[in-house]
Design a protein with these regions (language model features):
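Glycine-rich, flexible N-terminal cofactor/catalytic loop recognition
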Residues: 1-59
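A contiguous loop/helix-start segment that scaffolds small-molecule binding in enzyme catalytic cores
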Residues: 2, 156, 160-277
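Short active-site oxyanion
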Residues: 26-32, 105-108, 156-157
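Alpha-helix capping/helix-boundary segments
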Residues: 38-40, 85-86, 115, 165
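Conserved helicase motor
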Residues: 56-62, 136-139
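Glycine/small-residue-rich loop that forms an oxyanion/phosphate-binding "nest" at active or ligand-binding sites
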Residues: 68-114
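Class I SAM-dependent methyltransferase SAM-binding "motif I" and its flanking Rossmann-like core
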Residues: 95-153
Length: 277
C-alpha cells in the first residue's frame, strides 16, 4: 500500500493555534519534512511529540523529491510543515506536491493558520475578493514593475514583506498607489505584540520612520483594490494620450487630456512620460 503525504499547517505565532488534527497527524507519521528543523523542534517539543525530522527547503527540495517519493511508494506516511502557516503558500513544497500528484499519490491537507487570511480578516478592507501576491521582488525596479500591475487590480491585494525591505517597499507603494491609498500593515499576527498599523500608506510610512525598533519579523500588507471607475478613467487617459503624444508636445497632450477627463494634471503628466519612453 502506498503512503500518504500530509500538508500540515502550523501556527504563525501563537503555538496554541495548532489544530487537534494537526497534532494527531504529527503524532502518527513516519517522518516529518520541515522547512527548518530547528524551528520544527521547538514546535514539536511544545507539543510533546518525538518525531523523525528531515529538512526540505528551497535549497534542497528538488534533490529530496526522488527520496521522498520512494518512501511514499514504499508505504511511508510523511508530513510536510513550514516554519509557520500553511506549506506552499510563499513557502517550499510545490515541486514535491506536483511530483506526488504525478505519481498518483494521495496528498492530504491538514488546514490551519495562514498569515494572509488572518491579516485580511482583521484589516477592515473588503474580503469578498482578493489577490494574494506573496513576497514582493527584492530589487526596486522589479518591485515597481510588479506594483504597477497590482495597482490596476480591483480586488483587495495581499503582499508579504521582510523586515529588511519593508520601508523601501512602502515607499515604492506610495510612488505607485499614492500616499493616501487605503492600506493596513499587520505585524506579529497572533503574537503578544500583534499590531495593525495605518489607514493609508502614508500613515504606515510615518509609523516605520518613528518606530524603527518595531520593525521586526515578517509583515503582511493589505491594500485596497482599485475602483472600477478609476480603472475605466485610467484606460481612457491612456487612449487619449496614445493618440495625442505622437502629434503634440507632452504639455499640450496633458492639458487636453485633463480637460477631457477631469483627471489630475500631475498624474496625467506622470503617465504621459511613462508612455513617451
Amino acid at each position: 500500500m502506498q503512503g500518504e503525504l500530509f500538508i500540515v499547517s502550523t501556527p504563525i505565532g501563537n503555538l496554541d493555534d495548532i489544530t487537534l488534527r494537526a497534532i494527531q497527524t504529527l503524532q502518527n507519521i513516519d517522518f516529518i519534512l520541515a522547512e527548518d528543523t530547528r524551528v520544527a523542534k521547538k514546535l514539536l517539543k511544545h507539543l510533546g511529540i518525538k518525531a523523525n525530522l528531515q529538512s526540505l527547503n528551497e535549497h534542497n527540495e528538488l534533490k529530496k523529491i526522488p527520496i521522498v517519493l520512494k518512501h511514499l511508494l514504499e508505504g511511508k506516511n510523511i508530513a510536510l510543515i513550514s516554519d509557520a502557516g500553511t506549506p506552499l503558500i510563499s513557502d517550499p513544497g510545490f515541486q514535491l506536491v506536483k511530483q506526488a500528484k504525478k505519481e498518483a499519490l494521495r496528498v492530504i491537507p491538514i488546514p490551519g493558520c495562514s498569515a494572509a487570511i488572518a491579516a485580511l480578516s482583521v484589516s477592515g478592507i473588503p474580503t469578498d475578493r482578493f489577490y494574494f501576491y506573496g513576497f514582493l521582488p527584492k530589487t526596486k525596479n522589479k518591485r515597481l514593475d510588479v506594483l504597477k500591475k497590482l495597482v490596476k487590480k480591483e480586488e483587495t491585494i495581499i503582499v508579504y514583506e521582510s523586515v529588511h525591505r519593508l520601508s523601501s517597499s512602502i515607499n515604492d507603494m506610495i510612488e505607485v498607489f499614492g500616499k493616501k491609498h487605503i492600506a493596513v500593515l499587520c505585524k506579529e499576527i497572533t503574537k503578544l505584540h500583534e499590531e495593525l498599523i495605518g489607514i493609508n500608506l502614508e500613515e504606515i510610512r510615518v509609523f516605520l520612520m518613528e518606530n524603527p525598533s518595531k520593525i521586526k519579523g515578517e509583515f503582511t500588507v493589505i491594500l485596497n483594490g482599485k475602483k472600477s471607475s478609476e480603472i475605466n478613467n485610467t484606460e481612457k487617459i491612456d487612449s487619449i494620450l496614445k493618440e495625442l503624444l505622437p502629434i503634440v508636445s507632452v504639455k499640450v497632450a496633458v492639458k487636453i487630456c485633463s480637460i477631457s477627463t477631469g483627471y489630475n494634471k500631475n498624474k496625467i503628466y506622470k503617465r504621459a512620460l511613462e508612455l513617451k519612453i
